[in-house]
UniProtKB/Swiss-Prot annotation:
Compartment(s) of residence: Secreted
A Pfam match: Toxin_21
Major localization listed first in the record, in broad terms: secreted
Protein name: U1-nemetoxin-Csp1c
Similarity comment text for this entry: Belongs to the neurotoxin 13 (insecticidal toxin ABC) family. 02 (Calisoga) subfamily.
InterPro entries: Spider_insecticidal_peptide
Job of this protein: Causes paralysis to insect larvae (H.virescens). This toxin is active only on insects.
Listed GO CC annotations: extracellular region
Disulfide bond sites: 1-15, 8-19, 14-36, 25-32
Keywords: Disulfide bond, Knottin, Secreted, Toxin
Tissue expression: Expressed by the venom gland.
Source organism of the structure: Calisoga sp.
Length: 39
């Protein structure tokens, strides 16, 4: 995880990928607008 914020669609869905373990995933109204934010 290099960027502090990015759409999951650009990185294999951070919610289920390795980023999700350390980062927090936020679900927007649009399921395709998930975002992982650094803790």
């Amino acid at each position: 995880c290099i960027s502090a914020r990015y759409p999951c669609s650009n990185s294999k869905d951070c919610c289920s990928g390795s980023c999700g373990i350390f980062w927090t995933c936020y679900l927007r109204k649009d399921p395709c607008s998930k975002e992982c934010l650094a803790p």
